């Protein structure tokens, strides 16, 4: 629908060395506002709310400005705030720059909090083992979905040179991804109230004929009807 930046004027440059970018998009009939960020790096781990040059304070100010923007402008919207936020969401107060967000658990949730609190092998920044890349979602998403899947994507494990090759040629951060499950999967492809071989035959026909019909045939909700939907359907029939 639209792509634009917010907090672009000079008065916000201290908090946002890179202005947040908003993507307004529709997917599977739902509207989402995705706010991409790259917060100020570094610091000494101590949040000094008096010193405006303090790196932790700059990140603290940035996340609270984003919260204010969402609360005022997008109070009923499906909002995802993500990016390299350059700080630890699992840090103890009073030095957790995200504490105001964490305290407002009715309206906000870090989808990757379990990763941040878990084993360091799943963290997004291996060079100085820490989890700095986050996905924050609003209550419209976590209350309105049927499930969430979040994981750090270890592309380096698929490269011959491993982490060294990835770090040198791609990034020093691993991406963090989220899958939002908005609907309970339906295996009744033909809509006759029964799940059986006739549903497999119809789905095979759709796949072979490259039919782009979505509807109930898109079992995994990836906006395509393909072999992966067929695998899910056959697995369901074998197990039920």
Predicted regions: what is each one?
Residues 1-40:
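Structured beta-strand-rich core segments of catalytic domains in phosphoester-bond hydrolases
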Residues 4-17, 71-80, 85-184:
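Metal-dependent phosphoester-hydrolase catalytic domains
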Residues 13-17, 53-61, 92, 126-130, ...:
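Soluble non-cytosolic domains of exported or imported proteins
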Residues 20, 60-63, 67, 95-98, ...:
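Extracytoplasmic/secreted envelope proteins and their assembly/folding machinery
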Residues 23, 38, 66, 84, ...:
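Residue-level detector of buried hydrophobic side-chain packing
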Residues 42-58:
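Acidic/histidine-rich helix-loop elements
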Residues 53-76:
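A long, amphipathic alpha-helix that forms part
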Residues 71, 93, 189-213, 222-240:
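Alpha-helical segments with a strong preference for the paired helices of cellulosomal dockerin domains
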């Amino acid at each position: 629908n639209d792509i634009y930046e917010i907090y672009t004027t000079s008065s916000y440059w201290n908090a946002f060395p890179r202005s947040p970018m908003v993507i307004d998009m529709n997917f599977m009939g739902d509207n989402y506002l995705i706010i991409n960020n790259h917060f100020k790096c570094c610091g000494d781990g101590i949040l000094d709310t008096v010193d405006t040059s303090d790196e932790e304070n700059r990140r603290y100010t940035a996340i609270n400005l984003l919260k204010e923007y969402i609360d005022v402008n997008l109070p009923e919207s499906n909002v995802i705030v993500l990016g390299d936020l350059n700080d630890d969401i699992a840090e103890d107060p009073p030095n957790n720059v995200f504490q105001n967000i964490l305290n407002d658990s009715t309206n906000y949730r870090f989808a990757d909090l379990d990763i941040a609190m878990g084993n360091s092998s799943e963290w997004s920044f291996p060079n100085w083992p820490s989890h700095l890349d986050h996905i924050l979602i609003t209550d419209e998403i976590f209350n309105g979905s049927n499930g969430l899947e979040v994981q750090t994507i270890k592309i380096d494990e698929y490269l011959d040179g491993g982490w060294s090759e990835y770090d040198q040629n791609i990034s020093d951060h691993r991406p963090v991804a989220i899958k939002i499950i908005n609907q309970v999967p339906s295996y009744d492809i033909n809509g006759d109230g029964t799940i059986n071989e006739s549903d497999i035959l119809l789905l095979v026909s759709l796949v072979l004929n490259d039919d782009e019909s979505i509807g109930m045939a898109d079992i995994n909700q990836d906006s395509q009807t393909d072999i992966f939907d067929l695998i899910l359907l056959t697995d369901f029939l074998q197990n039920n």
